């Protein structure tokens, strides 16, 4: 298995798809990277030369924030919003949707499993 940016990328997949295993690299960025480095997107990872792998690694690390750097930047942005107490920071702190989605229904992923609240007991006659 080839390693790029600290990630094992699968040997049997086309390089265009295999690059998407790296956090911060999607299909569009993978295509841009391959076009800039002059590597055929249809070639399999196992068929890449060491020279091509080095070129890919240098291009990705030089032009984009990927993997750990990107994760750290995202975490820092969230912490900063929480610290300055802006609306998005308050939503992050409460564990609610941040970007204006409805919460009366839905938003279960963000809110977690339902917690049942005890209701009124029936009056006995």
Swiss-Prot record:
One of its GO terms (molecular function) is tRNA binding. It comes from the Bacteria. GO terms for biological process: translation. Keywords: Ribonucleoprotein, Ribosomal protein, RNA-binding, rRNA-binding, tRNA-binding. Gene3D superfamilies: 1.10.8.50, 30s ribosomal protein s13, domain 2. It holds the Pfam family Ribosomal_S13. InterPro entries: Rbsml_uS13_C, Ribosomal_uS13, Ribosomal_uS13-like_H2TH, Ribosomal_uS13_bac-type, Ribosomal_uS13_CS. The keyword Heme does not apply. GO terms for cellular component: cytosol; small ribosomal subunit. Part of the 30S ribosomal subunit. Forms a loose heterodimer with protein S19. Forms two bridges to the 50S subunit in the 70S ribosome. Located at the top of the head of the 30S subunit, it contacts several helices of the 16S rRNA. In the 70S ribosome it contacts the 23S rRNA (bridge B1a) and protein L5 of the 50S subunit (bridge B1b), connecting the 2 subunits; these bridges are implicated in subunit movement. Contacts the tRNAs in the A and P-sites. Belongs to the universal ribosomal protein uS13 family. This is Small ribosomal subunit protein uS13. It comes from Bifidobacterium adolescentis (strain ATCC 15703 / DSM 20083 / NCTC 11814 / E194a). The lineage of its organism: Bacteria, Bacillati, Actinomycetota, Actinomycetes, Bifidobacteriales.
């Amino acid at each position: 298995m080839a390693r790029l940016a600290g990630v094992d990328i699968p040997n049997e997949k086309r390089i265009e798809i295999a690059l998407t295993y790296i956090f911060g690299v999607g299909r569009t960025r993978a295509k841009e990277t391959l076009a800039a480095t002059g590597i055929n997107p249809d070639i399999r990872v196992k068929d890449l030369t060491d020279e091509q792998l080095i070129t890919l690694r240098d291009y990705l690390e030089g032009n984009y924030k990927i993997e750990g750097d990107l994760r750290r930047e995202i975490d820092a942005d969230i912490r900063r919003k929480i610290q300055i107490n802006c609306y998005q920071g308050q939503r992050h702190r409460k564990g609610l949707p941040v970007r204006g989605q409805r919460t009366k229904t839905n938003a279960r992923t963000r809110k977690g499993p339902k917690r049942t609240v005890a209701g009124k007991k029936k009056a006995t006659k």
